[in-house]
Curated annotation (Swiss-Prot):
Heterotrimer of A, B and C subunits. This is Aspartyl/glutamyl-tRNA(Asn/Gln) amidotransferase subunit C. Keywords: ATP-binding, Ligase, Nucleotide-binding, Protein biosynthesis. It catalyses: L-glutamyl-tRNA(Gln) + L-glutamine + ATP + H2O = L-glutaminyl-tRNA(Gln) + L-glutamate + ADP + phosphate + H(+); L-aspartyl-tRNA(Asn) + L-glutamine + ATP + H2O = L-asparaginyl-tRNA(Asn) + L-glutamate + ADP + phosphate + 2 H(+). The keyword tRNA processing does not apply. PANTHER family: GLUTAMYL-TRNA(GLN) AMIDOTRANSFERASE SUBUNIT C, MITOCHONDRIAL. It comes from the Bacteria. Its EC number is 6.3.5.-.
């Protein structure tokens, strides 16, 4: 018995705005059915004495210290702007 129908594959393709042929829909149905079948096999694995993990490596994120740096002066920013007025950068309007 198939775990996913061809109609479901077509529906997902439609939601993803993908145009697929009938042959592609059949092929994807078979492939997805195989993937789902494999994933279902994972439910059969005995994980009784396995400690839950959130990361497979025993490595923490190594980050630099979050130290604020002095930013650019208003003059330095304004000199790079194509259009400015009274210390503000002017941009084209996007709303009517």
């Amino acid at each position: 018995m198939s775990r996913i129908s061809i109609e479901e594959v077509k529906h997902v393709a439609h939601l993803a705005r993908l145009a697929i042929t009938e042959e592609e829909a059949e092929m994807f149905t078979e492939q997805l059915d195989s993937i789902i079948s494999f994933a279902e096999q994972l439910n059969e694995v005995d994980t009784e004495n396995v400690e839950p993990t959130t990361h497979v490596l025993k490595m923490k994120n190594v980050m630099r210290e979050d130290v604020p740096n002095k930013g650019l002066s208003i003059e330095a920013v304004i000199k790079n702007a194509p259009d400015h007025k009274d210390g503000y950068i002017r941009v084209p309007s996007i709303l009517d």
